[in-house]
Amino acid sequence: MVIKMFKPKGIFYEKEIENYELGKYLLKKYEDTPKVIIENHNNIEEMRKRQNKDFMDMKRNLIIGVRKTHNFVPNHKTSDYLVPYTSSGCTAACMYCYLVCNYNKCAYLRLFVNREKMLDKIIKTAQKSDKTLTFEIGSNSDLILENTITNNLPWTIENFKNTPNGRLTFPTKFDMVD
């Protein structure tokens, strides 16, 4: 599958992202892209009011924020836990995706810049366990696609690789991995 590099038409971001390394990186990377400061990445009135016909146009926006809640959901199908991680939504427009049904709530890509805090919780949970735990970090998005914007995949691997009793997994349909 060939995906063109994502270039957002606009960025909505929480001011707090300026306090994070990844937030600063993304603001610099997209310094020429129009930006709007928002209060909350979950409640962007301008996006909520859009009509269904605007779906593809909405997906051209990038939302950047700080993940406030980080609850692990027990999952005994493919992992021990489903873990909200560094993104939600997607830049692709696959017609079979469940996000299409809920587009105005979450189909556009939301990036979360507090990755250190999120990964630290995963590592601490694994370290406390007597058995190996598997954490699925891709149930809300596609980490491979997100990685083309954030470089979070190599960052995650480097910072997690020596974690005892911990495994990470994520589903993807993309192959943009070096």
Each language-model region and where it sits:
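Conserved Radical SAM active-site core
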Residues: D54-M56, I63-T78, M95, L99-D178
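Cysteine-centered iron-sulfur cluster-binding motifs in ferredoxin-type domains/subunits
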Residues: Y85-C94
